[in-house]
């Protein structure tokens, strides 16, 4: 079973590390090409392209400039411990033990605009380059064209190594668009998380993101490998709703708190 999640805009390069083990990202040659493109942008251009403040644009111009491909624990950090958004609040990788990291390294992948695909222990240097950004590059008008089949091929390699051909899509739409489902050699399952609001169940972005992290942790902690095991997910008040679920879309609901 291969879990897919999105990266986060918020990064943490200060907290104590839960592990000293690390690996190197597998697509750094491609990342380097994107960095070369990004370095041609001025801070005001970055601000417009990403829709961010001047201060953040300056920070990211500096990050692009400082980025260099020889990753060490001194200049980079394991991806699963560097990302700090809502998904990662649910995941709580900082509390993983060695066996959890082992399982995650085999079964969890983070999609990334700059790095393509990251394994949990892959070192990464700080960046901001969302998959949906229209950064023109030698391969096309945006990052989807840049990555083409590369991300899908890398996921198929991981699936081949595991032998259980199931992908659990816990990534956002923006990021999953970088994957070619028809070329993915796996059964695709998408968990959906609905929260009750004024008597109706709907996707509430903040809760749904955290729930994706909770589900990822649930799979890792319990070493799940079969799709039917996912329906037991019951963290923080969620329950499986068989009636509205289908074989490839598992619906989990939670009553208003």
Curated annotation (Swiss-Prot):
GO cellular component: cytosol
Pfam families recorded: H2O2_YaaD (PF03883)
A single BP term in Gene Ontology: response to hydroperoxide
InterPro entries (alphabetical): YaaA
Stated family: Belongs to the UPF0246 family.
Identification of the protein by name: UPF0246 protein YaaA
Species per Swiss-Prot/TrEMBL record: Salmonella typhi
Name of the gene encoding the protein in the UniProt record: yaaA
């Amino acid at each position: 079973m291969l879990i897919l999640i999105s990266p986060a805009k918020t990064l943490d390069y200060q907290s104590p590390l839960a592990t000293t083990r690390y690996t190197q990202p597998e697509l750094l040659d491609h990342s380097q090409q994107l960095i070369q493109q990004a370095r041609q942008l001025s801070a005001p251009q970055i601000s417009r392209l990403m829709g961010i403040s001047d201060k953040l644009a300056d920070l990211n111009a500096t990050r692009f400039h400082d980025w260099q491909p020889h990753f060490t624990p001194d200049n980079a950090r394991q991806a699963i411990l560097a990302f700090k958004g809502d998904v990662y609040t649910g995941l709580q990788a900082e509390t993983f033990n060695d066996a959890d990291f082992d399982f995650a390294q085999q079964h969890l992948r983070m999609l990334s605009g700059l790095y393509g695909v990251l394994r949990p222990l892959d070192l990464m240097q700080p960046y901001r380059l969302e998959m949906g950004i229209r950064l023109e590059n030698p391969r096309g008008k945006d990052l989807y064209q840049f990555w083409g089949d590369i991300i899908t091929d890398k996921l198929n390699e991981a699936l081949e190594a595991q032998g259980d051909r199931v992908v659990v899509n816990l990534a956002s739409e923006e990021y999953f668009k970088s994957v070619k489902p028809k070329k993915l050699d796996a059964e695709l399952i998408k968990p959906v998380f609905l929260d009750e609001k004024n008597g109706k169940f709907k996707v509430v972005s903040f809760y749904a993101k955290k729930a994706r992290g909770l589900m990822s942790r649930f799979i890792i902690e319990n070493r799940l490998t079969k799709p039917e095991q996912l329906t037991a997910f019951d963290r923080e008040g969620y329950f499986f709703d068989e009636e509205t679920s289908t074989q490839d879309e598992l619906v989990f609901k939670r009553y208003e708190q």
